[in-house]
């Protein structure tokens, strides 16, 4: 999948959905009314190099190509792609070594619950409060950047450091579902950024088939 092919598929989807090609079907694809198939301006190589130098981490090549040739956020899965500089949206991260620290997970992860959820006051217990503090700790997502908000506090993120660098993962801790890799519905394998984006385009286009 080349960027040219990706752009052609995107333009087709934009025409079918965002362009109102079919009467009454405008912005039928989930989240598309938010981004309306528009991209933000592309980033320059100098900006990317400055970002990588600041955080001591190298962004995946396919993601960088997208940022410099297609757009810095905008049209994409769910409510669209976040701009690069919004990589830590809603996260309290002030550590420049965050992105250079290895992403800690190899497989899907979720924490066990060592408290009694049948207790009406379990959220007031020290056990729960300790569990909650650790569960939502940013240490579970070091070496990654948020790139897309799916809704319901679910975020897609791109791993940039470690064995899984280049892969898309999902942070679904807000719904007690932990952290897990995005899996292709067609191949069953884990997805790189462009594979993930292309799969979204394919699935969205199939809605109009």
Regions found by a protein language model. Give the residues of each.
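Polar low-complexity intrinsically disordered regions
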Residues: 1, 156, 162, 168, ...
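Surface-exposed loop/turn and secondary-structure junction residues enriched for glycine/proline
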Residues: 62, 84-87, 161, 171, ...
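Long, compositionally biased interface segments
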Residues: 177-209
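Extended serine/threonine-enriched, polar tracts that run as long, contiguous segments within proteins
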Residues: 137-164
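A surface-exposed partner-binding patch
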Residues: 1-145, 208
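Segments surrounding the PLD/"HKD" phosphodiesterase catalytic module and close analogs
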Residues: 155-190
